[in-house]
């Protein structure tokens, strides 16, 4: 693609602000702007004009249908397609799309998770247009980003609470900015940049593995001779087949207005990453959902399959999603960007203090937002941050915080340089913060990088939590400082008190070190090791009170989300255990039994001929013993599957305590049998095929 074509391609399938300026009247465009920036209502006449322009634009580009595109609590996206046609005279049709069609739709909500927010027979749900998210074209359909709510008004999606949290943190942050004399900023916008990791495998091999097709990850697989020990895949040369996929992916994402910026190989074989430019949290969430969908579709065009599971292969790194979060004013200021020197920037330090306090007080809830079975395979496994929340600030910023706590003057080290050691190369200015890859929440110069997210999950939940927690702390600060008679003195006291009271959450060391887990326990930090431990904190009183107070969730809405996550935990493990049992019964046990029998027959024939058969006997004996144990393990797993309690919380605990050990035992035995079996006798592709064939 030529350089000239790229600007034309970008956003070509998006009904964006530039297109609105071209196609709407000045009055209608301004009405839409007021709706987005000020929350003003949109008159039906303006909605009709926007709908008409949107339809004309879409039809010109080959669209025949439209859909209200929304994000239910499944974590995926949903859409129902309606054509533009309407009956006309003489058996003909006309194309129609009104303001009412744009602004509101009706969906059967009975098949989406609701967590008890509606009865089964209460099927009616409503979708409502989000005017702050641009409509886009996907495969001949005009997609209109919307929210989803029940007939009773409860939020049944992930976008509604995200929008609420963005408004709330903006409101509280503006109060703080006013105290510092900022009278220009009208809004504060949470901005997010999610780095998306993924695996690519050959489609033919994928189709031969029931576990990949049913669960998205391998449930069996012996360690191959080579994994990621050579450290040669990370940032390595991109193979032609993968490069073709990435090029196609970029072009499709750019056409959809998604700021795909960086692409590279990741640490594990067959693992890669795409990182976008930061944008507002609402758009970033829409874009990330769309990115995951487009990745899967583009991969199929290249006879590949894109795996978004957190741990598709044992023994090599899994996939995460680093969530880079910051607060920016509508005048272009990043509130987490220090001034000329951080020590002189009181406003920055106050926002930093709010973040530190919030993460400390709601560390359990932040952990719960990333809690699900797939992520349990990553967190704390020396490839991802531990399950203990902590904040990395870097040496200089931590030194500033410590000087504030001690009441001593901070002596700035000055700008350091990196000496390369080559005469022709100039010294390079060194950043004030290093990149601590082991930290779950790292300050990286002008933002915080929340590194605990799983690769497959929606980024809405974690960002709703960050926005709401920050809003709570800023509200407390504003309530206190707005009454101050001596602002500067009270500000300094507040910052010192907050850092003193919450310094336990700050940790700049190696999060992979076992010593840190012991130290975290001494500090009183929570260590919710598994999703089964973390999910119940959704409904802890302090957490429910927080979200209800700020109007992000009603009590019913947050309880519903907890119930959905808890039920999903058991559902995922049940599907994995059933898939494992099916593969054992129909593929692995027959294959290993057949090969063991062949060894015995071969040994008997050698015996008749007086030829040594010690090797055959030894392998047959080990395989026979392992097969018996594997058969027993399969039966136990099937028995345990039949005993799952009806109560959701009990079922989650039972699945964690019984199904996971059952699956681990079965896998251990099966993987050893794979190592003893000839390649041609194993019933499906092995790791060396899957990881090194693309």
Please give the residue ranges for each predicted region.
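Basic/polar N-terminal segments that are highly enriched at the extreme N-terminus
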Residues: 1-7, 692-694
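Histidine/acidic residue-rich metal-binding segments in metalloenzymes
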Residues: 4-99, 104-119
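Glycine-rich, acidic/polar active-site loops that bind/position phosphate-bearing ligands
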Residues: 123-308, 317-320, 327-565
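Active-site-proximal loop/turn and secondary-structure-junction residues that shape catalytic pockets
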Residues: 46-50, 70-72, 100-101, 148, ...
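Hydrophobic/aromatic-rich, well-ordered segments within soluble, folded domains that form packed cores
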Residues: 63, 67-71, 287-301, 327, ...
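C-terminal amphipathic alpha-helical interaction region
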Residues: 495, 500-694
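Short linear, low-complexity motifs centered on an aromatic residue
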Residues: 75-90, 107-110, 209, 216-218, ...
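Active-site proximal loops enriched in glycine and acidic residues that flank catalytic Cys/His/Asp
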Residues: 46, 70, 98, 276-278, ...
